[in-house]
Amino acid sequence: KLLPVYQYLRGRADKEGGEGLTCGEEQILHKVDSTVRRGAQGLLLGGFHTPNHRWAIASLLMACSRLFDSGRMEQAAYTYLNEGIDCNEDGEFAEKSAGNYNRINNDAMILLSEATGDPAYEQAAIRNLRLMLTYWEPDGSIFTANSTRFDKDRLIYPKDYYMEYLKMGMKYNIPEFLQMCNTIFDIVDRQQITSPDFLIWFMLHPEYRKLEIQGGYRRSDFEGFYQESGIARGQREGFTYTVMNGKSSFLYVHNKTMKLEMKVAGSFCEHRAFKSEYMERISQGEYHL
């Protein structure tokens, strides 16, 4: 979160005829500048552990290459980006981490577009945000059972997607994204959880503070089959259902107050629970595993 703070303070310091910085703010800028520069230099050494680390590293290197006019940082960023972005046409990233790492990836894609001027990166974020509109449950939580990371089956609410919906909704005039911003705050209020981390972004982009959108996102009944991701999601009369390929728990039903998880178990030599090898759609709401 230091980068937007640095951009905000540096923008005010560089602004001709602007309000300038107070003595205290100048001291903060000096410390943050040193931290960001040293951090960017450290990222040049490379090294990552999981897929989402690539995009976090690449996006920060690219942004810092613009801030510090560094060709080395830009070149290092492209060594990661040349691998290709692991977001499929469904909008799902490789780790399928709807509860955490997908939004980390979205932040990285948006930052890459801002730094390079190439809108192709943030299109991956837009695809994922559209997918996420089908991933929230009747109680306002996110469907996380498909994740391959620590957030699997955890109770997580979508508050950290707020700024992504706001940024992309405003930039591309997507009403459902802006309505989802209101819905996220409704969920925050209803669940009595902390609000999204938005203050520094509102300071950095005053245009966000001027936006007024009435009403939240009201999702009608739907049925979607994301074949490349091996998952189907649907909603009927207040409950959601999920069918997944390659999972021992292949069916989930959620009605706001209760979640049902289904598996077929047996015992034959090394085989235990049933896991499908393929998934096909027979008709609307009907799937064959």
Short names for language-model regions:
Residues 1-123:
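Aromatic-lined, polymer-binding surfaces characteristic
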Residues 119-289:
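Extended polysaccharide-engagement surfaces of secreted carbohydrate-active enzymes
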